[in-house]
Amino acid sequence: GGFFYYLLVSLAFRLGSTLWLIPIQFLSYYLSGSYLYKTVMHMTNKKEIATLISIIFYVTNGTLGFGGLYPIQFAMPFVLGAIFFLTRYFAGHSRDEAFILYGFAGTAGALFEARTLIFWILSLVTIFVYNLVNKHFARGFYQVLCIIFGNILVLYLCLYFILNLQITSDYINQVLVYNFTQLAVEKNDFLLTLAYQSFAVLGSGLLIGALTTSNHLLGDAKDKSIKWVLLLSFIFTVVYSLFSQSFGLYSILNIVPYGLVLTALSLDDAIKKRAERTSHRRRN
């Protein structure tokens, strides 16, 4: 977890119970599901797929994240909100000023769950390459300024507490350095946990989308920039789950935002192929 996560937990203990976190978590679920639904609707234009994926999202959080209050669950609204924003941006439907919100979401999400930085870094690199290829130099520079401004809005509050509490070096070492240098979160048997987590990832069905997205990534495929971000984020994040040396299923929650969107694309492909076969049979 990050600074905002521990701040929320501390406030809950100050108020006497972690039950105070439940309304915040329900709000997080609602916002996450809403952004996920909008993203899937944009990519597939099918309400039934968007609804199904949203239901799977809530079921997955209820099973893999049983008990709740995990950092990634509070970070998901920011991650899925950014995915929806980038989907619209690469489709030409977002204004450059909206990158202030993207910068805000990126910093806030990372301060709830540091490992979401994988997604934020990959998305920033993709935005840079996209602007470079399309020669949007002035727009790219303006977007950077907007992102920095959005970052500052969040970092100012965070740094105020960190500096006043004199925990700067401890925070950097324990939250940032540790999360990206230590894959293991527990000390269970490596091979057993690797087999267990591999089976859990396979059983979750989240690999389906990642393994069937090739036709969405090349040529003139729609929204291919954000799909590359999702696939790479999925791959890098799933490594953390597989090598966590933990029997906890909650580690798979980190791949849910990316895996479900990719799975929605796979479902859309399956429906289209089925419709083509039906149409072909009717002609014959």
Question: What is each PLM-predicted segment?
Answer:
Residues F85-A108, F137, Y142, C146, ...:
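Short hydrophobic alpha-helices at membrane interfaces in multi-pass membrane enzymes
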Residues T44, L80-L101, V133, A210-K222, ...:
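Membrane-interface transmembrane helices that cradle and orient dolichyl/undecaprenyl
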Residues F119-I152, L217, V261, K273:
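Perimembrane helix-loop-helix junctions
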Residues G1-G16, F26, G109:
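Short hydrophobic/aromatic helix or loop-helix immediately within or flanking a transmembrane segment
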